[in-house]
């Protein structure tokens, strides 16, 4: 039996009014990939911040042991010196610097008072080769994909002689190719005796990669098990504290009249002159959930941002809303016609991160909270309270900045913003991306509730089980065209993928 490289015992961490960690025990063996799972708010990030010295010794109760020796980190530097490296979802690379400069940032290779550039580049090449990355160390990081930037972070950790590498949602922004590369590297590191703590909501990756899984819930350790003793459903049940008999709580309903009709619709990109949407026709009914599936680059987002007036391109074709022909050129016009659009990138397009929940949730419906063209703060608070309560938002206060919320709660704020405007047509682009299974379930219930109230919903998703589990009808796109249409009972993953790859 391999010895423990890390033991955290009785870790308790409190913030004003909140016990984030409650007597947590977490032990990791040398040379294993150890998954740390839990819903947003379960305590995963807090525990890792305790381990990495972000929360210094004295700010928490409990003890930490590295290779059997108690450690008391007062800052991040001390944890790094002990062999701990943490790679966050938001990468800490400097894009204007070269790969080599990033690798040795903070521990530069010196010759006297000056950087030894020849040695720096040759050492960088060595570490890049160690993780199988064939790139010039003099390349500017800005020219690399997000996946390769993440691998640079791993190489940087290894260059500091890291014994334990913590990866926080490492595949959230990666392409399938980059994910495959990362998986291979993690397996290689495991064979070299490097320990990886793997935090991810993607349980299929956990099942594939991890040796051991620890589940946290509400700041407590629920279980630690070998992966071969668990199923994905059992992990979910431990995370949420209940059995999820159906991951996708579909509710049959009667759909109403046609509220959106698109006929022979094409879009030409203004910059490239390329036709990104080709002769598309479809309809949406009140109370219907219309799933949109397709591979990356299939044109799903371009189609619906164009219909919403948010895509810069020349349009051909006809659009009707409630039987009336419309020509929407700006999002403001789409909103007037009762449309709402939840973007796939909530942080960039859906929220003002440094503003509070109240202001974010009323952004689209300012007319509802103004008197004589002046915002009535009391009315704004009242409206925000009502809509966020309906969304079951979890936050310490509505005056908290949305940047401080979990991914699931941020998405609820985005939904609140649009629902305050009472839309007839709600377009959801990757609505559950980057949120945990418990929060996903809550989002699905909200979607069902809205559909039962007669809202027509477009559900764009890269997750086939999500599209199949939630939709009444599914359209498949490939290269800007609709290549397949299925009723709920007809759809299979094989049929959808055949259409998504251009087959029939």
Curated annotation (Swiss-Prot):
GO terms for molecular function: ABC-type D-xylose transporter activity; ATP binding; ATP hydrolysis activity. It comes from the Bacteria. Residues 6-243, 260-504 form the ABC transporter domain. ATP binds at residues 38-45. Its EC number is 7.5.2.10. The keyword ATP-binding applies. It is an enzyme of class 7 (translocase). InterPro entries: AAA+_ATPase, ABC_carbohydrate_import_ATPase, ABC_transporter-like_ATP-bd, ABC_transporter-like_CS, P-loop_NTPase. It catalyses: D-xylose(out) + ATP + H2O = D-xylose(in) + ADP + phosphate + H(+). One of its GO terms (cellular component) is plasma membrane. SMART domains: AAA. Part of the ABC transporter complex XylFGH involved in xylose import. Responsible for energy coupling to the transport system. PANTHER family: CARBOHYDRATE TRANSPORT ATP-BINDING PROTEIN MG119-RELATED, XYLOSE IMPORT ATP-BINDING PROTEIN XYLG. Belongs to the ABC transporter superfamily. Xylose importer (TC 3.A.1.2.4) family. This is Xylose import ATP-binding protein XylG. It comes from Geobacillus kaustophilus (strain HTA426).
């Amino acid at each position: 039996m391999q010895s423990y490289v890390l033991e955290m015992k009785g870790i308790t961490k409190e913030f004003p009014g909140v016990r984030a960690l409650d007597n947590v025990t977490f032990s990791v063996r040398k040379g294993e990939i150890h998954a740390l799972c839990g819903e947003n708010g379960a305590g995963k990030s807090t525990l890792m911040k305790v381990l990495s010295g972000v929360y210094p010794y004295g700010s928490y109760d409990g003890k930490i042991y590295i290779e059997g020796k108690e450690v008391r980190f007062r800052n991040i530097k001390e944890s790094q010196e002990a062999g701990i490296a943490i790679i966050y979802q938001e990468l800490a690379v400097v894009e204007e610097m070269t790969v080599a400069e990033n690798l040795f940032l903070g521990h530069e290779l010196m010759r006297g008072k000056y950087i030894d550039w020849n040695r720096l580049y040759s050492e960088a090449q060595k570490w890049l080769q160690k993780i199988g990355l064939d790139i010039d160390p003099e390349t500017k990081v800005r020219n690399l994909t997000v996946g390769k930037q993440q691998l640079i972070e791993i190489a940087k950790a290894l260059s500091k002689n890291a014994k334990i590498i913590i990866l926080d949602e490492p595949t959230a922004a990666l392409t399938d190719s980059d994910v495959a590369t990362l998986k291979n590297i993690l397996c290689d590191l495991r064979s070299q005796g490097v320990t990886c703590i793997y935090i991810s909501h993607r349980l299929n990756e956990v099942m594939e990669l991890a040796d051991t899984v620890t589940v946290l819930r509400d700041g407590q350790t629920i279980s630690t098990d070998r992966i071969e003793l668990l199923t994905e459903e059992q992990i979910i049940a431990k995370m949420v504290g209940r059995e999820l008999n159906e991951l996708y709580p579909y509710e049959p309903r009667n759909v109403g009249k046609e509220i959106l009709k698109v006929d022979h619709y094409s879009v030409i990109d203004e910059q490239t002159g390329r036709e990104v949407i080709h002769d598309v026709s479809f309809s949406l009914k009140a109370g219907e959930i219309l799933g949109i599936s397709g591979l990356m680059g299939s044109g799903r987002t371009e189609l619906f941002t164009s219909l919403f007036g948010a895509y810069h391109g020349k349009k051909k074709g006809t659009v009707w809303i409630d039987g009336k022909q419309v020509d929407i050129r700006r999002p403001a016009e789409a909103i007037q016609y009762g449309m709402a659009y939840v973007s796939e990138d909530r942080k960039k397009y859906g929220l003002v991160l440094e503003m509070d929940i109240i202001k974010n949730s009323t952004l689209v419906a300012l007319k509802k909270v103004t008197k004589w063209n002046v915002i009535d703060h009391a009315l704004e608070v009242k409206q925000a309270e009502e809509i966020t309560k309906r969304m079951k938002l979890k936050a310490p206060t509505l005056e908290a900045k949305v940047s401080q919320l979990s991914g699931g709660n941020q998405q609820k704020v985005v939904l609140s913003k649009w629902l305050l405007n009472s839309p007839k047509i709600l377009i959801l682009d990757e609505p559950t991306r980057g949120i945990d299974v418990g929060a996903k379930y809550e989002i699905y219930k909200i979607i069902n509730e809205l559909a039962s109230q007669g809202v027509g919903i477009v559900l764009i998703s890269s997750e086939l089980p999500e599209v199949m589990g939630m939709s009444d009808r599914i359209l498949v796109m490939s290269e800007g065209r609709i290549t397949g249409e299925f009723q709920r009972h007809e759809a299979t993953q094989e049929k959808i993928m055949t259409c998504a790859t251009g087959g029939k």
